Amino acid sequence: MAKWLDNAIFYEIYPQSFLDTNGDGIGDFQGIIERLDYIKKLGCNAIWMNPCFASPFGDAGYDVADYYQAAPRYGTNADLKRLFHEVHKRDMHILLDLVPGHTSVAHPWFKESCKADRNEFTDRYIWTQDWQQDPDDPGPKATLAEMENVMRFWIGMGCDGFRVDMAGSLVKNDEDGKGNIALWRKVRTFLDAEFPEAVLVSEWGEPDKSLQGGFHMDFLLHFGPSHYNDLFRCEEPFFSGRGKGDVAAFVEKYKENYEKAQRKGLICIPSGNHDMDRLARSIHGEELKVAFAFLLSMPGAPFLYYGDGIGMRYVEKLHSVEGGYGRTGSRSPMQWDHTTNAGFSAAPKEKLYVKQDESADRPTVEAQMADPDSLYHEIQKLINIRQAHSALQSRGEIEFVYAEEKQYPLAYLRSDDKEKILVIINPADREVSFDGNYAVREALYTFGGEAVFTGGKVTVPGGSAGFYLL
């Protein structure tokens, strides 16, 4: 496994919404290049960029029309290669978003596959509901070989690997996952032979399967059995200050996945992504700081969705754009400063491909960087602490010491062969306590007040988070 994943912290870029440098109302590769220093200063050292290939953009670029060509609205292949170079100049890494399970109807493969006369593309797509080919039949094998060619092309140009869209769905009617696992094992064998440092991250949501398939990491997501939504995106999120949430089911499922994942790969807990409501739609203000203390102290590589680091909001009541439907409000343009269109674009407001948050109090990078008490600075502080302590990084062990049903706080130990750190997270706006004897050497980080350790009991202030070196 690539060594750089040990301390990787990812920043997800939705390219059309990040920064527009040519005034067409759509973000571009040059815009990403111009903001790499911001990403690095925040503390992130890796990037996942959403699809950037040629597309009619009926589904935000997930409808690929040419896997070998950058979307002209973002730039050229040469521009993308330059982006890879600029990322690497800063000792960072970048993953592209690979969409292997479907294409746009505009893709030449699909147009050929539609023809009545059989040809080399006839079996590249599934055309019937009543039967399907075996993954080892010539048609599916040719498709897999072509996906390997796509990977070979972009890794050769300089990308460091791929986040794979809907990775667990390529083999249909595969209830136990064995068909998909076998398919991805073949891809892993190919990569290990030609590009052993290339990283694969899956959108699967079942680490017990994806990591068997050779992925380095899998996300816990808003779908699937992880109880991820219990944390931030349900009627009573655990990270709401109301303190009516429940983290127990999430922890039980996490422990189950963690045991299965040991020595095979990593489990990632993202702040959000382009398919979810913004984090700030359900939790707010200081609650966000406590949430990031959790996200940045768990095993696996953290993923920060663009804008989450300044508390960007879900923009309500937007018309669907590029197939976003209810997700469109989470894809609004990045808010950089106080200038026109919050610094995203010099285009007239009505020319932006999707509307922005037009609130007078919308958060911006400029304002948050100027405010020492901002969410931006809290995240920066948390990342610095994580990078200074290997026990808090991707491969440090975790042991949950308090995660009771409908109770607060959440407490867990992070450890490696160098140190042991107790993490206590209390989003509830009330003081709580739990039993435990801990000899604390140093409070590495506190927000909202410091826990008190006396008489075999730990008393935790409301709305607080703390990392304690034992």
Regions found by a protein language model. Name each.
Residues 2-148, 156, 167-210, 214, ...:
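Acidic/aromatic-lined carbohydrate-recognition and catalytic surfaces
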Residues 5-7, 214, 252-253, 270, ...:
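Loop/helix patches that line or flank the sugar-binding groove of alpha-linked glycan CAZymes
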Residues 16-18, 54-55, 100-101, 160, ...:
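Short, solvent-exposed loop/turn segments at secondary-structure junctions
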Residues 35, 79, 83, 143-154, ...:
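Alpha-helical packing segments of well-folded alpha/beta enzyme cores
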Residues 46, 91-93, 151, 160-163, ...:
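Beta-sheet entry/capping signal
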Residues 105, 111-113, 117-140, 188-333, ...:
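Conserved alpha/beta catalytic core and glycan-binding cleft of carbohydrate-active enzymes
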Residues 431-449:
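Beta-strand-rich binding/interaction modules
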Residues 454-470:
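C-terminal beta-strand-rich structural cap/linker in extracellular carbohydrate-active enzymes
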